[in-house]
Amino acid sequence: MSSAAKFVHLRLHSEYSLLQGAMRLKSLPDLCVEENMPAVAVTDKNNLFCALEFSVSASSKGVQPIIGCQIDTQYSELKVGETLPKIAPLVLIAQSENGYQNLMKLNSCLYLEEDKRGLPRVDLLELEKYSDDLICLSGGPGGPIGSLIADGQIDEAINYAS
C-alpha cells in the first residue's frame, strides 16, 4: 500500500445491515487495497455480526479493521402527548478493547428494551454508562443533533452535543 492514502471510510454498512448495506465482506479488503485505503470501519445498523469475519479478512490483506456500529438511540425523553420516543442513529467506533466491550454491551441493550413499534434502541443513560473508549459520530441531518435542530430545539441540540 503506498503512502498516498486519501480516504478512510468510517461509516460503511455491509451485507449484514439488512435492507441498507450491499457491500460484501469478502470483497471489501481487496477494494480497500485497490483504492489505497489503509483502514476501513464497518458500522452495520444495530449489530456486530460481521466483526470477527471482517477483522480477520481485512487484517489478512494489510488493511486495518475498525469496528463500529450504527446504533439507534432514543435522544430525548417523551414529552406530554407523545406516545413514541424520538430515535436517531449514532455511529459508535471502538478505540480499544474496552471500547469494543462497551460496544457489545450497548448492542445487547438495543434488544433488551424496545419501543412501542418493537424497534431496538438504547437510551442516553445506557449510552453514557458504556461510552468509555468509544468515538461517536453524530453527523448528518438524520442524527439526533440534526433532528433537534430541524425541530427548532437549538438549546437541546447544543446540550446533547456536549
Predicted segment positions?
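Phosphodiester-processing cores and adjacent nucleic acid-binding clamps
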Residues: 1-162
